[in-house]
Regions:
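Bacterial Sec-dependent N-terminal signal peptides
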Residues: 1-24
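Contiguous, structured surface segment used for ligand recognition
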Residues: 19-170
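Conserved, mostly hydrophobic/aromatic
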Residues: 61, 125, 368, 438, ...
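Feature activates predominantly on carbohydrate-active enzymes
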Residues: 99-275, 293, 345-349, 359-377, ...
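Gly/Pro-rich turn-and-neighbor structural signature
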Residues: 159, 231-234, 239-242, 269-390, ...
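Structured mid-domain segments that build the active-site/substrate or prosthetic-cofactor binding neighborhood
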Residues: 213, 218-221, 227, 370-376, ...
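Catalytic domains of carbohydrate-active enzymes that cleave complex glycans
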Residues: 467-695, 700-708, 719-721, 736
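Extracytoplasmic
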Residues: 623-827
């Protein structure tokens, strides 16, 4: 069979742009080292995480070659020498001689180098060595996602190493990890079906740890809704340490204790109230530190309310200071070392940020973890002064969320470009010590995890263009160029469509049925599904499971959901005039509802032979509030009608002009900046922003040109609608501003996000609607003369403003969710 997966170029290409250059080949050539009959040597004193990685290398070698190989031999005579600085004497000698000098004093760095007729994998520390081993296996063709996304492994007769030295340097972010969260019902059911337990035991976590390490991560917050990592299986912590993964506990689980350890024993521990129950809670905290003593684990400090809630209605800074002081005293007493010798993190999540804003400060060695707003936008960044803190800053980012205005648990709704833009923002403003990603059930967030981990290694490798190329490289690591290119485009397009409105927020009222907007968006998904199916037919059987999980299922599931709600909208619209065609649309709703269940069932029981049974049982149809507290997916309401015997200069159209922000007439950029177009980012096309955000905006401007001569009506003013991304005031300036002026007239100042805050009185009236829709629409009214050609100028006064669309209304514009189809344009 002619294969289209795993071309030589594809194997050589690595998933992340941060990886070292290709060095594994499958055909002999000049200046290569053969691994035919290779053996491996390493010091028995190596940390268990290195020895585990070597064991995986041996297994991977056998998977690729089909032969038992890489037998271990003593001493330093193996074909492959693996070792860590300070542990392996031969490695230390090479460092001293200058062969591996670039490892000295480095963190988590590896060097892969041919020295004589040996291949050396050396690490500056234990994780550096592990990362070097997994870089080799990845280039051999074993994807980090071989287990979690069923990436097939192609066999080769022989393996060759191009002679030279290879590395990808040190990580830019010190702690790079995942948070398993909101794990019921999907992950919990899958674990029960797969491992036979009602909790995540060490067999499950071993799979998670291996994925993290193969992605060059080093950190995990374990699942905590109903599970207790430490208490459920004592082997969990042991395996984490053996594999070299640093553990922590989530933002509301202080002192290395899982919340379930308290929740299951409330009678023993008493009220979760430090003012009234200090003695018991201190004892609870102390046990956590005693258990993690001697590990690399990171201790969460501070305290939130019982069960991921606020501790009180107001920020009691004095109480929080007391709690943190006592926690640090316990850390010092238990470890026998100053508290600053144990890495600690304080998470400014939701209401906890109020403590910081109210003036509470923690010791300088404590890392401060900033959060996004659960919808992918950074809430705030440290000031220039704050960035100098010894403890540094971290970011807690979400691609899964349970909470208002609506859960996002079923599918990945995070745009690649949004994650890139916001993580770049975070890094540029000094958030560089910890990045942790809330991934829900882990699946189906495979690609966001890959991008997050790759960016955490070196964010500066990424630009607007290269982040789009990253998606292509991700699929090219599995398929040939033609298939990978189409798969990447389908994936990115689906992310763009998903970000318009989440599946949980989507309903019959979302889009305008009268203007044709609903038909347009449903057609968008129908065309995308057809593309996805056509591509599926071109993929060999052994590589289809990966494609079904990451591309085909999400597209089909959403295309069907759009069909269902479009049919419901048509049914309700036609039923108001007693049109009997409403009944046909009612039947369509029922068909789509049933198809949704069949698609999910196929994911659970058919993909990879039923390997992922339980992963796709999340409710997503029937939300009425933020939570999924309804029994099961609910058939949307329909009406039945009784049947008896018995429809870059723009030209105005229909009384308005709609312009994509990308289609400007001209631009002006300040010194050191440029206007950057983010593809796939807007509601309908793209978005535009002045970059970098760290530079002064100066006199930067966007100019648009339009012709109103086709309008017969008389008017003295125009209403200009400016649509921007719902960026938060991350600089804490009192809101970001831009100006709008017409034909050189007096500019009007617009502050678009001053009230975009998650607290009263703006939470329900402005914040939730804006973040759910992901855009802010502001309207200004400007005087106009009756000439034909007009020029509109928009000037940002603050950095970080992302423009999506502009509508100039001369009296004919009707409000639409996607702000109307773009007007006719000439260039």
């Amino acid at each position: 069979m002619k294969k289209v997966l795993f071309s030589l170029l594809a194997i050589m290409a690595t998933l992340g742009s941060a990886a070292s250059e290709p060095f594994v080949f499958f055909q002999a050539s000049a200046d290569v080292l053969s691994l035919q009959g290779a053996s491996v040597s390493f010091d028995s004193r190596e940390h268990s995480c290195v020895q585990r990685a070597v064991a995986n290398l041996q297994k991977d070698f056998e998977k690729v070659t089909g032969k038992t190989g890489l037998s271990r031999i003593s001493g330093e005579s193996g074909t492959i020498i693996i070792g860590t600085v300070g542990v392996n004497k031969q490695i230390d000698q090479w460092v001293k001689k200058g062969e591996l000098r670039d490892l000295k004093g480095k963190t988590e760095k590896y060097i892969i180098k041919t020295i004589g007729d040996q291949l050396v994998i050396a690490g500056s520390d234990k994780r550096g060595t592990v990362f070097g081993i997994y870089e080799l296996t990845k280039q051999m063709g074993v994807s980090p996602w071989y287990y979690w996304a069923d990436v097939p492994i192609e066999q080769h007769e022989a393996l060759y190493i191009k002679k030279g030295e290879y590395t990808d340097g040190e990580p830019s972010v010190r702690y790079r990890g995942l948070f398993l969260n909101d794990e019921a019902p999907c992950l919990t059911t899958w674990v029960k079906n797969t491992f036979g337990t009602n909790y995540g035991d060490h067999r499950f976590y071993e799979k998670v740890f291996e994925l993290i390490l193969r992605l060059k991560g080093n950190f995990l917050w374990p699942a905590m809704w109903g599970w207790a990592f430490y208490a459920d299986d004592p082997e969990n912590l042991k395996v984490a340490d053996e594999m070299g993964v640093i553990m922590g506990t989530s933002h509301h689980e202080p002192m290395a204790r899982n919340h379930q350890e308290y929740a299951r024993n409330r009678n023993k521990w008493g009220a979760w109230n430090y003012q009234t129950n200090k003695e018991n809670l201190d004892r609870f905290f102390r046990e956590g530190i005693e258990r993690m003593k001697g590990t690399d684990d990171i201790v969460t400090i501070g305290m939130r309310g019982d069960g991921d809630e606020a501790m009180s209605e107001t920020a009691d800074t004095k109480l929080m200071e007391t709690i943190i002081d006592n926690q640090r005293r316990i850390i010092k007493e238990v470890t026998g070392k100053p508290a600053e010798k144990t890495t600690q993190v304080w998470a400014l999540y939701k209401e906890v940020q109020d403590y910081y804003d109210a003036g509470l400060r923690v010791p300088d060695d404590v890392m401060i973890l900033i959060s996004d707003d659960n919808w992918g936008d950074i809430r705030r960044v440290p000031t220039a002064t704050e960035r100098s803190r010894k403890g540094g800053w971290g970011i807690y980012y979400h691609v899964d969320y349970v909470g208002a205005p609506r859960n996002t648990k079923w599918l990945n709704v995070t745009q690649t470009q949004q994650m890139f833009e916001q993580l770049s923002l975070a890094y540029d403003f000094g958030i560089q010590r910890m990045w942790i990603l809330n991934v829900g059930d882990l699946k189906p967030m495979e690609y966001p995890i890959q991008l997050f981990m790759d960016m955490a290694w070196n964010p500066k490798d990424y630009t607007v263009q290269t982040v789009t190329d990253h998606t292509l490289r991700f699929f090219r690591s599995v398929y040939d160029d033609a298939i990978a290119t189409e798969a990447a485009d389908i994936y990115n397009r689906n992310c763009q469509y998903m970000a318009r409105v989440t599946p949980e927020m989507l309903d019959a009222r979302t889009y305008n049925i009268k203007t044709g907007e609903w038909r347009q968006v449903a057609d968008d998904y129908q065309r995308l599904e057809l593309r996805a199916l056509r591509l599926y037919d071109q993929i060999p059987a052994e590589a289809r499971d990966f494609y079904r999980q990451l591309v085909l299922f999400p597209v089909q599931a959403m295309a069907n959901l759009y069909d269902m709600y479009y049919a419901q909208a048509m049914n309700l619209h036609l039923a108001t005039s007693n049109n009997p065609d409403a009944n046909l649309w009612a039947d369509k709703v029922k068909q789509c509802f049933r198809r949704d269940s069949l698609l999910c069932a196929a994911y659970n029981t058919d993909i990879a032979g039923g390997k992922w049974n339980g992963m796709m049982i999340q409710k997503h149809i029937g939300y009425r509030s933020w939570n999924d507290n309804f029994r099961a997916d609910m058939l949307p309401r329909v009406r039945t009608v009784p049947v008896s015997d018995g429809g870059y200069t723009f030209e105005a159209k229909d009384g308005y002009v709609a312009m994509e922000a990308e289609h400007y007439y001209s631009t002006t950029a300040s010194e050191g900046t440029k206007w950057t177009v983010y593809p796939y980012y807007g509601r309908t096309r793209s978005a535009v922003a002045l970059t970098p955000y760290t530079a002064a905006v100066g006199n930067a401007a966007l100019t648009y040109r339009f012709n109103l001569s086709t309008l017969n009506s008389q008017f003295s003013t125009l209403k200009v609608h400016v649509v921007t991304k719902s960026t938060l005031d991350f600089l804490d300036t009192g809101g970001f501003e831009y100006t709008v002026s017409l034909d050189g007239g007096e500019p009007q100042v617009v502050n678009f996000n001053k009230t975009l805050v998650d607290r009263q009185p703006y939470m329900y009236s402005e914040y939730y609607p804006a973040v759910a829709r992901r855009v802010v629409e502001k309207v200004v009214e400007l005087p106009v003369t009756q000439k034909e050609i007009h020029t509109l100028t928009i000037q940002p006064k603050h950095p970080g403003i992302v423009f999506e669309k502009i509508i100039v209304d001369a009296g004919g514009y009707q409000s639409q969710y996607l702000f109307g189809e773009e007007s006719p344009v000439k260039r």
